[in-house]
Curated annotation (Swiss-Prot):
Complex formation: Part of the 30S ribosomal subunit. Contacts proteins S8 and S17. May interact with IF1 in the 30S initiation complex.
Originating organism: Clostridium beijerinckii (strain ATCC 51743 / NCIMB 8052)
GO CC, any one term: small ribosomal subunit
Cysteines paired by S-S bonds: none
Protein name, per record: Small ribosomal subunit protein uS12
Length: 125
């Protein structure tokens, strides 16, 4: 335990918190252009074909982002908005593509959790 005079001389070091989404540079979202759109398989206990895109951001970073929801309309040169948030069973995927923003369409026929997938409220019959 330090003495008071040692604390006056040096002070306490604050622990540096490492960012989970460094490519965003403290921004809530960033715009980018898809360079590759493909599927990949998840880690060991899970099995699927997860849709991902390699995105070149406006700040020069190139990141891998997950495309959530059922079906998508993305291809190379699509302009997308990405947010932070990793995918636990895909190593290296630390970003999500925002559905319903820029070139990425919302999920069709989505009735629950619509705001997370950019789906409009369905018309009443």
């Amino acid at each position: 335990m330090p003495t008071i005079s040692q604390l006056v001389r040096k002070g306490r070091k604050t622990a540096v918190v490492k960012s989970t989404a460094p490519a965003l540079k403290e921004c809530p979202q960033k715009r980018g252009v898809c360079t590759v759109v493909k599927t990949t398989t998840p880690k060991k206990p899970n099995s699927a074909l997860r849709k991902i895109a390699r995105v070149r951001l406006t700040n020069g970073f190139e990141v891998t982002a997950y495309i959530g929801g059922v079906g998508h309309n993305l291809q190379e040169h699509s302009v997308v908005l990405i947010r932070g948030g990793r995918v636990k069973d895909l190593p290296g995927v630390r970003y999500h593509i925002v559905r319903g923003a820029l070139d990425c369409a919302g999920v069709a026929n989505r009735l629950q959790g619509r705001s997370k997938y950019g789906a409009k409220r369905p018309k009443k019959k």
